[in-house]
Amino acid sequence: MQPSFWHEKWDAQQIGFHLSAVNPLLIQFWSQLKLPANSQVFVPLCGKSLDMCFLAEQGHDVLACELNDLAVSQFYQENNLTHTVEKVGEHKRYSTEQITIYQGDIFSLQNTNSVELAKTSAFYDRAALIAWPEAMRLQYAQQLACLIPAGSVGLLVTLDYPQAELNGPPFSVSDDWMQANMGADFEIERLACEDVLSDNPRFVKKQVSSLTESVYKLTRKG
């Protein structure tokens, strides 16, 4: 996923990945992480997701990162959140009482924000890992591990389908890929795996033969 691709999607508002409500899987499974209310939760590639509002409503402090400036601006505007904006290193830091978003490249985030990141005890990834083609996905997974302190727990959602039948994003991520490429840094527990083909018209129209959605609990080793 090149930055230009992402910016073009937001400029054209071609954001089919954005949900107009909180993700039901987040509502269903978040409590299984058993986090204290005041835990800091890291949300990578957050877009303008309403899931951040849900996490804040649970009493968490949300620390997020998003490449596109329009996405971040729309999040605060559409949710009527008074916020401040300041330049911090290579990033712009948008902040309100419980939700802080660093706008910029996630791969340089630790250079800007190591102090705040060190306070993280949880993370949530609904559409970040699956946004990357396989050639770039491992680099993202390694960066996530780099940003997350040892002992942190997270909820991660994937889609798995025959990649040859449809071009991503979202890209297919299998359970085998998870175990092989993230198992060194995370303890991995799959909480659920459901057939969701009939719920996704784009995949049906493209005659994709199967589509499953999985929810994982990840615990950072170390």
UniProtKB/Swiss-Prot annotation:
It catalyses: S-adenosyl-L-methionine + a thiopurine = S-adenosyl-L-homocysteine + a thiopurine S-methylether. It is an enzyme of class 2 (transferase). It is found in: Cytoplasm. Its EC number is 2.1.1.67. GO terms for biological process: methylation; response to metal ion. GO terms for cellular component: cytoplasm. PROSITE patterns: SAM_MT_TPMT. S-adenosyl-L-methionine binds at residues 10, 45, 66, 126. InterPro entries: SAM-dependent_MTases_sf (IPR029063), Thiopur_S-MeTfrase_Se/Te_detox (IPR022474), Thiopurine_S-MeTrfase (IPR025835), TPMT (IPR008854). GO terms for molecular function: thiopurine S-methyltransferase activity. The keyword Cytoplasm applies. Gene3D superfamilies: Vaccinia Virus protein VP39. Keywords: Cytoplasm, Methyltransferase, S-adenosyl-L-methionine, Transferase. Disulfide bonds: none annotated. The keyword Methyltransferase applies. HAMAP family: Thiopur_methtran. Belongs to the class I-like SAM-binding methyltransferase superfamily. TPMT family. This is Thiopurine S-methyltransferase. It comes from Shewanella piezotolerans (strain WP3 / JCM 13877).
